[in-house]
Amino acid sequence: DVCSSDLNVPRLMLGHSYWTTTPLSELRNIRCQLRDTLDKHQVGFWQTETCIMGNDEEIGGGNGFDHTMKTALYVARIIHHDIVYARAESWQWWRAIGGDYKDGLIREYTTDNNFLDGRVEDSKLMWALGNYSRFIRPGAVRLSVSAFDQTGALIPDGDTDQQGLMCSAYKNVDGTY
C-alpha cells in the first residue's frame, strides 16, 4: 500500500504471458480474468514480455527460426487478445535478434563465436509486430467493434474468431485511425 499512495508510482501491473497462450480455449478466459481482477483495483496492465515457449504446440514450440506467416499470425492473435481482453496499454516482445529459435524477430547467422561477422534475416513476425507499432500509436484508444449476421442480428463476440478473423479498431491521439 505504500506504493499505491505514491503519486509518482503508476498504478500498473506488468506481466509476462508465458504459459497463458495455450490451450487456445483458455487464451481469452485468462485475459478476461486478469482484466476483471485489475479493474476491481483500478490498476492498468502492460504486457512486458512475450516469446514463443515449448507449450506453443500449434506452431511447433519455440525451436527453429520461422520465416513463414505461421508464427506471425499466432503472435498477432496473442496481441489481439492481450489488447482487447486484458486491456493491455503497452505490449512488448522479448528479443529482437536471435539464433535458430522463434523468439528472435531477426535471425542472426554468425561465422565466428564473437558475433563480429555473419549475416541477418528478417522474419514475418517482425513485420507483424511492426504493423501494430506503426498503426497503433502510444495513447491510442480502442474503438468498439460489432459484427452482425446477414439478418442484422448482433453476433456475440463476433469481433474475434480465434482461428480466423479478429477485428479491433483504434483511434490515435493525432486523430488518425
Task: Locate each region found by the language model.
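Glycoside hydrolase catalytic-domain groove-lining segments
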Residues: 7-58
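Short, small-residue-biased leader/transition segments that mark boundaries at the very start
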Residues: 2-4
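Aromatic/acidic polysaccharide-binding cleft in carbohydrate-active enzymes
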Residues: 44-157
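Carbohydrate-binding surface patches
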Residues: 150-177
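Generic recognition of flexible, low-complexity loop/linker segments
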Residues: 32-35, 77-81, 165-168
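Hydrophobic side chains in beta-strands
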Residues: 15, 93, 131, 169-171
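Extracellular/periplasmic catalytic domains that process cell-envelope and extracellular macromolecules
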Residues: 6-9, 38-40, 84-86, 120, ...
